């Protein structure tokens, strides 16, 4: 079975000479790189089919790289691969021989031969010049080697072996990978994959701490999961592998109409024949729709929270007003009871003129006790009023406080004076409280303006007109 194990070991020795990599670490990293190669191929095939290309073109490969990798990594891989492809093309161009029409004489042929021999001698000079090492100009070695670690011959063998193992799992696999299986080993897609493998492997090994003696599977897995870009690539590799498995399960007849839509979120494809591939414009429209629906949900949540707060405020206001009403009613009841007691006491005094002094003393004591109890009730009521929160902005807190102080400082010697003073204080306090405060709870509820409480589209002009603002067309 072909693998990237030798390449991983070479790159690890070059980047981490002080560390060793375990077999489990090599196995995990090899599977990660193989899945990444498959993701690039799956998206390249999808791009080729969606644009109705007969084969995989460079624009399809670059589109796949932009989907699988973040923009910075994709741009780096594309630029390096383009430079390598141009360099290889120039070297191959130098080997092309020009054909003459026979019009040249033998002297011209001899001169051409001399120039060719001179150029070959200059190109084959591999000696060092002023301390610089000259790279041997051997096209047989370097034409297919993108880097020292991941030659494209190895990339091609591992990719084809990966496809074969994936097809063995399925009883009747489709021809999804047929377009890549028909390509030669020097196809440009392997150049791009080779650079992608080296860039990602280098990124993983560099992030491993230099103090690590043994690089195992857990360390590599943790590095990938902790890095946002690498973890994103890992998720896309897994999803692309699942998509390829579904496509291989499809029959060859229905696979021609099967569309695979891979985007930055890797949307899973449907096996229905009527499904169509989303274009970039349709994807943008879908994104805008999702964003609008998200904004509407957020607005509903905020609006409901606002309404809950307003309801709580109304409930607190209602409780305060109920306490005030209860306090005033208690005061009125106490006044009536005291008046009745005073009348009864006066009648008893008139009817019982001849009662002895002991009875008079008892009556006086009873009166004093009644006055004390009444004073206690008044003090309790004053404390209740003092603890209340302000209900209406029209009520003047300073006047209420003065009235409470008057209530506490009333002379307790005469019940009639107490009753008259209490009634006058209550009247003065009630004058400052509007009659609407004593109405039902529904009238007391202050709801926010409809402009900030709507749950469906409204006519803004109509709302402004209801508020007294009229707009005229100019």
Curated annotation (Swiss-Prot):
Record InterPro entries: Histone-fold (IPR009072)
The protein's name in its UniProt record: Histone H2B.v2
Compositional bias of kind Low complexity: 100-110, 276-286, 329-368
Family indicated by similarity: Belongs to the histone H2B family.
Molecular function via GO: DNA binding; protein heterodimerization activity
Start and end residues of each stretch annotated as Disordered: 99-123, 276-295, 328-394
Superkingdom per UniProt: Eukaryota
